[in-house]
């Protein structure tokens, strides 16, 4: 039943029945571990691959000996964010240049650029922005066999040999039993051509090698080549059509394609997959031997003729150096050929080589050669070390190719297995480290070319390593990866869960992966091998569904990049579940029978049930306890972190659970975070691992606590200082604020939470608020999932969040002189400057609204030609003040708030600024947003809705004791959505609140319906959890009882303030001259084709005409209309829309001359702006262009022919109508324009 559990420094009442045998691992280990590997191993590997770089003549060689990263970054993480720089350290490489003619050696240390460092939280700071590198799920290198059926139902087998990089080999069969090969996606040739080219030139040799196979004979009949030379030339013609083929060039091409480690790379994982697939042990197990098999080293008979080969024997055969075994299948003798590798630790070696720690299988022929040539132990071990690259080759070998062909032929007889490419045994993760290593390799390959060229050009005696190496390509490759790769993403920082999930994300998209358009259903589907590795619930809705996933809670990634899941071993002899934990990849797991975590055990850890329900591959089976191999570690292991935070997940439909997981990531941090009453027990772990809380580094006593600093004196008398982040802006504009939760004099332990971050409450993740909800209708205000809330939530700031926006102003050098940040702004009243300091920068604490100046800035205007008199006056009285215009930074439309921080950077102070920028001011404006109508809220079960009305507290329905509800939800939102978890949460919440408990109900192992009913009865509630409610307006009881209780509700990032938008005039598109669209562009609302039909249907001709002309793209018409409105005159006739002129131009470009003719055959001239000056004409009066800046004063623009539309009296054209006019300077006596606001 319920038992108290300590979570951080809180106690929760847990309903868990299963004891956790394994601690959950560090949740961002994927990132950290991978990057650590890169710095320690990955870089070294790349340098080793590329060095030495030799000149074309071979007399110079450049080696990369060693590298080091300096350990002190120039700026701290926070400073990098402030200064827009990258958090990086310099990388120094030790380089040795050898002149082989003179024997001269020059060594020096070369700077190889700044290398971005990973922060403690597993992120990178690139140009001041925090970014995450997402792991990519790609197809693993290896050999894949698949089968199709032709139109007669005949089985055709095809194979693909995929390296990490290099040429693909593809085998395919046709209906006539001929086996073809494609090399590097070119035209196909019979497979025997490839065998001949590899040295098996005659038909007899080929049949001897692979056995008398029908398919082989058919292929040999089809094959026109008869010798190695002919075969090589045939292949060369396919690979290089149009080039004159020679045997030599064909040989070297084939060698370069497959057997050159620089061109063909299997990577460690490819070699592992090849050996696993092609090794004999997996292929001959459980088959009958056609001959007796003798151990070639000891002479011992392993298997008699006709005897079945057991798994153990198969492994022994493989590791004693036998590569070919003949087996009997339906009375036929079939040759099975391995790829000639053995496990060196199991091979009968004369010496002990376990000290070498070789995990991979090694090439037998090379191993034999070493053993034949060397006799004493030390020499053998040294030689093995030196020839490691040959023993475990990175490229494909002749043995591999023959083994793959043998496998293809064996499949006809049912020997071997078809591969499923969606199985996680065949897909692997490329994490940060590997992705970076690949980029670095590209950079170094470019560098290699440069070095080789410079070696030939420069004087041999003068050359130094420094002037050979140009680090640009390396730096560029790394910068390009971090800056613009699809996998380098701007971190989702809405709340701590969003951060954590982003770092654990797994994407099948990106370079070398799939594309959204090509990915079919199979790839996106949940696969049985995802169990315990990738969450079946958490994936985006929309085009990326199933292509982006999330790692499960206990998953980890092994050295080959395969995802492993943990299991407890079951001791089969006694039938006891042990506490030994085994991590297995998906293909290893396929061989075992695995029980679920919630299978009941007795006190001795033995299975209670006669039959245990287990998994075997995709089957669910019931077996006796003696057959079970493993057992799950925890019920949580199949879901991701976000999903495991949904209580009663087992009672929710998967589609809604998916929405619930995704919406928790969009919850906005509130002012007063509150941990859920009904949690799942994982909140603490998630908050701690997300890195937003502050943990004590050592045991000690708290000496000082301030809002922004905590000091702890440790046992050995040192003082640890912790500086807290106060009201910083996150990537998504939410507020990051840390608050101490310890007091002076408290004793703290190492690893204890001493400060809460955003959305955390005493070290637990707290994304929302516990509110009293009732499932009832109220006057139709909860129609279609709308939510009715009480004013109490607004008044108490329960759902209030702080949002911080950042605005930048830069003073640059222009052609006409430098811009200046100043308080002296032309045509601006003192009122607008009241909050600016003497530099023209707003003071901290000022309250600003849309249009207010944040930073005063002026830009020089173009000087007009001076008259002779003016020149004379200038000469006498000195320089007149330069003409300047106002380009101040203002608060954009619809924004307002309080200035919380101002940062000023200038060249004079030695700050690094972009070229051409002399000064930069950054202003942070914070807004306190209370919950309002139109905001989106959601529970954790995918139950989302928009707030429709905020009701006074006194009108809300109330409980018998007078407590008003805080939220009314629509009961119809439950049945069809099948997310019953929310109802159970509400019932349990009611009880928990009454008992004063905080509850943990873990997923798949939480409170049952019976538990809840028992508690309801114990707390004195009705067993159905329903309560009689009363109408707040009349005090009358409602007809029916209502389900009432506490639910955890989140306020999501879709806030109405960010979506409200209105425009009168604004920027226009350049070609069509129609208003832009979207809030970001300050655009208009699109009036599309169907809306036009609606107006046509009602015959609203004038409305329609003005929508299509003056409100859109009739350029001169809209200026005149604006003028007319401003002066209070009648609106003139509309002109011709610009888009019509564009159409005419397009028709003219097709050589069709188009004229517009009136009813009485008069041609209407289409005015065109051909003069250079007039390119931007009409907007000039409004001073509107795309950026919404004024460019040229109207007087210069309006020349002949454009003024005709204006009345005589306005000699002065409107000087300063901006596209958001607040004031006009039109000198017109009979019109006071002060109060116009359009």
Curated annotation (Swiss-Prot):
Sequence ranges of Acidic residues compositional bias: 1193-1238
Coiled coil, from the record: none
Keywords of the record: DNA-directed RNA polymerase, Nucleotidyltransferase, Transcription, Transferase
Source species, domain of life: Bacteria
Any one GO biological process: DNA-templated transcription
Ranges where the record places region Disordered: 1186-1238
Any one Gene Ontology molecular-function term assigned to this protein's record: DNA binding
Endpoints of the signal sequence: none
Pfam families the record matches: RNA_pol_Rpb2_1, RNA_pol_Rpb2_2, RNA_pol_Rpb2_3, RNA_pol_Rpb2_45, RNA_pol_Rpb2_6, RNA_pol_Rpb2_7
Entry keyword rRNA-binding: no
Function, in words: DNA-dependent RNA polymerase catalyzes the transcription of DNA into RNA using the four ribonucleoside triphosphates as substrates.
Assembly description: The RNAP catalytic core consists of 2 alpha, 1 beta, 1 beta' and 1 omega subunit. When a sigma factor is associated with the core the holoenzyme is formed, which can initiate transcription.
Protein name: DNA-directed RNA polymerase subunit beta
Classification of source organism: Bacteria, Bacillati, Bacillota, Clostridia, Thermoanaerobacterales
């Amino acid at each position: 039943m319920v038992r108290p559990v300590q979570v951080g420094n809180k106690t929760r009442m847990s309903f868990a029945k299963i004891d956790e045998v394994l601690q959950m691992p560090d949740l961002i280990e994927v990132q950290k571990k991978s990057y650590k590997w890169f710095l320690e191993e990955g870089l070294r590997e790349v340098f080793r691959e590329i060095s030495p770089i030799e000149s074309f003549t071979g007399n110079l060689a450049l080696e990369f000996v060693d590298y080091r990263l300096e350990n002190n970054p120039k700026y701290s993480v926070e400073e990098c964010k402030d200064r827009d720089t990258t958090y990086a350290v310099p990388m120094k490489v030790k380089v040795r240049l050898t002149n082989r003619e003179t024997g001269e050696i020059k060594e020096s240390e070369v700077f190889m650029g700044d290398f971005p460092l990973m922060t403690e939280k597993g992120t990178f700071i690139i140009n001041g922005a925090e970014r995450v590198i997402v792991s990519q799920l790609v197809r693993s290198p290896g050999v894949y066999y698949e089968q199709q059926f032709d139109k007669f139902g005949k089985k055709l087998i095809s194979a693909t040999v995929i390296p990490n990089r290099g040429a693909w080999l593809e085998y395919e069969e046709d209906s006539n039993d001929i086996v073809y090969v494609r090399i590097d996606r070119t035209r196909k040739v019979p497979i025997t051509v490839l065998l001949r080219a590899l040295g098996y030139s005659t038909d007899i040799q080929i049949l001897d090698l692979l056995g008398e196979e029908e398919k082989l004979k058919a292929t040999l009949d089809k094959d026109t080549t008869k010798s190695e030379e002919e075969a090589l030339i045939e292949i060369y013609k396919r690979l290089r059509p149009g080039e004159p083929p020679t045997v030599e060039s064909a040989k070297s091409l084939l060698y370069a394609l497959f057997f050159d480690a620089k061109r063909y790379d299997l990577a460690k994982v490819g070699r592992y997959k090849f050996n696993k697939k092609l090794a004999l042990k997996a292929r001959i197990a459980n088959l009958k031997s056609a001959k007796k098999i003798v151990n070639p080293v000891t002479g011992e008979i392993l298997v008699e003729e006709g005897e079945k080969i057991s798994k153990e024997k198969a492994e022994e055969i493989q590791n004693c150096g036998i590569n070919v075994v003949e087996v009997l299948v339906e009375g036929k003798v079939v040759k099975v050929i391995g790829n000639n590798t053995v496990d060196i630790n199991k091979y009968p070696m004369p010496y002990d080589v376990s000290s070498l720690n070789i995990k991979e299988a090694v090439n037998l022929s090379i191993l034999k050669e070493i053993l034949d040539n060397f006799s004493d132990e030390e020499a053998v071990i040294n030689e093995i070390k030196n020839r490691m690259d040959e023993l475990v080759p990175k490229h494909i070998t002749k043995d591999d190719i023959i083994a793959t062909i043998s496998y293809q032929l064996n499949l006809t007889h049912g020997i071997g297995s078809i591969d499923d490419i969606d199985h996680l045994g065949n897909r692997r993760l490329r994490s940060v480290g590997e992705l970076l290593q690949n980029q670095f390799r590209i950079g170094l390959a470019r560098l290699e070319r440069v070095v080789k060229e410079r070696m030939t050009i420069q004087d041999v005696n003068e050359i130094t390593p420094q002037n050979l190496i140009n680090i640009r390509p390396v730096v560029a490759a790394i910068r390009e990866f971090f800056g613009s790769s699809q996998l380098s993403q701007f971190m989702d920082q809405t709340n701590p869960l969003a951060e954590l999930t982003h770092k654990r994300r797994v994407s099948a998209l990106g370079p070398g992966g799939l594309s959204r358009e090509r990915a079919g259903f199979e790839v996106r589907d949940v696969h049985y091998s995802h169990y315990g590795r990738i969450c079946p619930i958490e994936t985006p809705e929309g085009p990326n569904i199933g292509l982006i996933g999330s790692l499960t809670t206990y998953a980890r990634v092994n050295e080959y990049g395969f995802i492993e899941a943990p299991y407890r071993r079951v001791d089969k002899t006694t039938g006891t579940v042990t506490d030994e934990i085994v991590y297995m990849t998906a293909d290893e797991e396929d061989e075992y029978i695995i029980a679920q975590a919630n299978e009941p055990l007795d006190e001795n850890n033995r299975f209670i049930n006669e039959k245990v329900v287990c998994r075997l591959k995709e089957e669910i089976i019931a077996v006796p306890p003696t057959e079970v191999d493993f057992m799950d570690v925890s019920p949580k292991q199949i879901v991701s972190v976000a999903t495991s935070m949904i209580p009663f997940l087992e009672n929710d439909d998967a589609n809604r659970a998916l929405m619930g997981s995704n919406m928790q990531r969009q919850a906005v941090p509130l002012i007063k975070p509150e941990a859920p009453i009904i949690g799942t027990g994982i909140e603490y772990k998630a908050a701690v691992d997300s890195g937003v809380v502050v943990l004590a580094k050592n045991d000690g006593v708290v000496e000082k606590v301030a809002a922004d600093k905590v000091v702890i004196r440790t046992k050995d008398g040192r003082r640890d200082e912790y500086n807290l982040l106060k009201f910083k802006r996150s990537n998504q504009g939410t507020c990051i604020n840390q608050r101490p939760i310890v007091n002076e004099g408290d004793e703290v332990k190492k690893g204890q939470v001493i400060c809460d971050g955003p959305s955390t409450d005493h070290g637990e993740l707290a994304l929302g608020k516990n509110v009293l909800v009732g499932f009832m209708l109220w006057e139709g205000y909860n129609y279609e999932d709308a939510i009715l809330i009480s004013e109490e939530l607004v008044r108490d700031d329960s759902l209030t969040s702080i949002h911080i926006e950042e605005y930048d102003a830069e003073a640059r050098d222009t052609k006409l002189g430098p811009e200046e940040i100043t308080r002296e702004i032309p045509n601006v009243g003192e009122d607008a400057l009241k909050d600016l300091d003497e530099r023209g920068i707003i003071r901290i604490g000022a309250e600003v609204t849309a249009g207010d100046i944040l930073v005063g800035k002026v830009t020089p205007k173009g000087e007009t030609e001076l008259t002779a008199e003016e020149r004379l006056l200038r000469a006498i009285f000195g320089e007149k003040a330069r003409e300047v215009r106002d380009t101040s930074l203002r608060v954009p439309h619809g924004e307002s708030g309080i200035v919380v921080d101002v940062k000023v950077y200038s060249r004079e102070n030695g700050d690094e600024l972009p070229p051409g920028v002399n000064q930069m001011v950054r202003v942070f404006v914070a807004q306190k947003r209370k919950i309002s109508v139109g905001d989106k809220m959601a529970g954790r079960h995918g139950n989302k809705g928009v707030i429709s009305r905020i009701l006074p507290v006194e009108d809300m329905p109330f409980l018998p004791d007078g407590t008003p509800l805080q939220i009314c939800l629509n009961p119809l939102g439950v049945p069809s959505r099948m997310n019953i978890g929310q109802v159970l949460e509400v019932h349990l919440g009611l009880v928990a609140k009454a008992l004063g408990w905080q509850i943990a109900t873990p997923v798949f192992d939480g409170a049952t319906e019976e538990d809840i009913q028992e508690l309801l009865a114990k707390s004195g509630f009705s067993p159905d959890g329903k309560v009689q409610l009363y109408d707040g307006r009349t005090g009358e009881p409602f007809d029916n009882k209502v389900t009432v209780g506490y639910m955890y509700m989140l306020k999501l990032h879709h806030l109405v303030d960010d979506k409200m938008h209105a425009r009168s005039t604004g920027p226009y598109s350049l070609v069509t001259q129609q208003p832009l669209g979207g809030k970001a562009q300050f655009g208009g609302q699109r009036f599309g084709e169907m809306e036009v039909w609606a107006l046509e249907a009602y015959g609203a001709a004038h409305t329609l005409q003005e929508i299509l002309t003056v409100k859109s793209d009739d350029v001169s018409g809209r200026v005149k209309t604006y003028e007319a409105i401003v002066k209070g005159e009648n609106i003139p006739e509309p002109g011709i829309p610009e888009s019509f002129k564009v159409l005419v131009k397009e028709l003219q470009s097709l050589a069709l001359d188009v004229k517009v003719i009136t009813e009485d055959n008069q041609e209407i001239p289409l005015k065109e702006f051909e003069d250079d000056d007039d390119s931007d004409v009409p907007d000039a009066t409004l001073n509107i262009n795309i950026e919404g800046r004024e460019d040229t004063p109207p007087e210069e623009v309006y020349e002949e022919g454009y003024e005709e539309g204006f009345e005589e009296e306005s000699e002065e054209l409107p000087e300063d109508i901006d596209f958001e006019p607040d004031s006009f300077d039109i000198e017109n006596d009979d019109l006071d324009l002060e109060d116009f606001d359009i």
